[in-house]
Amino acid sequence: MIKKTLGGKMRELTAEQIQKNYDSLINTIQLHITGDRKEKVLKMYEDMKDRFMMAPASAKEHYHNAMYGGYVDHILRVVDLSLKVKELWEQNNCKIDFTDEELVFSAIHHDLGKVGDLQHDYYIPQDNEWRRKNMGEIFTHNPKCEYMSVTDRAFYLLQHYNISISKKEFIGIRLTDGMYEEANKSYLMSYKAEFQLRSTIQYILHQADMMASQIEGRLTKESIEKEETETFEKIKNIKEVLSSDDKPLEAQDKPGKISTDLFDELFGDKK
């Protein structure tokens, strides 16, 4: 679906798709997370269920999944691609020194901070029409949500629910954004052998996250192009009908009604 905004269009998930994605995420947790922490993870998702379900993955229409439900949609894609990238690495004799649980847990929670803190959403709708129209800001950061980096807030939420993580999960979550996060440079640009990273989990997660973002960006672009093409065709049809005014009256086929019908189709109910 496409939703028109003051600044353009955006992809939109239906209520059914949002519910289905959330159910898939819970099933993924049930399948891959083990031990005592599974129940703690499930409690966190139950406590903030509505916020998890509705959270967008980003704020601007030209970013990835700037739509309600975009967060979970993105997380599911990163989980799927992480497992596929790991398989590709294995096929090429690359080092795999982590479990599937560590990989999936990290993929699920790498953007956890985008849900917000314990009381407030991270993103709220942008109510400034100028910024929506001219800057494509569908959402904006919630001023009630105390500043933390997305990654730091993820760790804060996990510790609040007493959810333990392994060292590899910590590194994986910390470095999923790669060099796009300034704080990651000290991990990724080490020139001393003893300081170099000792796992590959972060590289696989970063590749999966980047791939997911590119896919989501393409889906948004294709949706916009499709609606623009359809709109162009509707305008073309209206122009053709209006040009019939040059014809003799008896040659016209109720131009007023046809023009009105096409106008309504393009711009909606005028009432």
What kind of region is each of these model predictions?
Residues 20, 24-31, 39, 43-47, ...:
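Charged/polar, solvent-exposed surface patches and flexible loops
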Residues 33-38, 53, 181, 216-219, ...:
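Residue-level signal for secondary-structure boundary elements
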Residues 235-271:
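Short linear clamp-binding motif
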Residues 3-133:
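Acidic/His-rich, divalent-metal-binding segments that scaffold phosphate/diphosphate chemistry
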Residues 221-222, 230, 234:
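Positively charged, structured surface patches that bind polyanionic biopolymers
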Residues 62-68, 73, 96-221:
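Divalent metal-dependent catalytic cores for phosphoryl transfer on phosphate-bearing substrates
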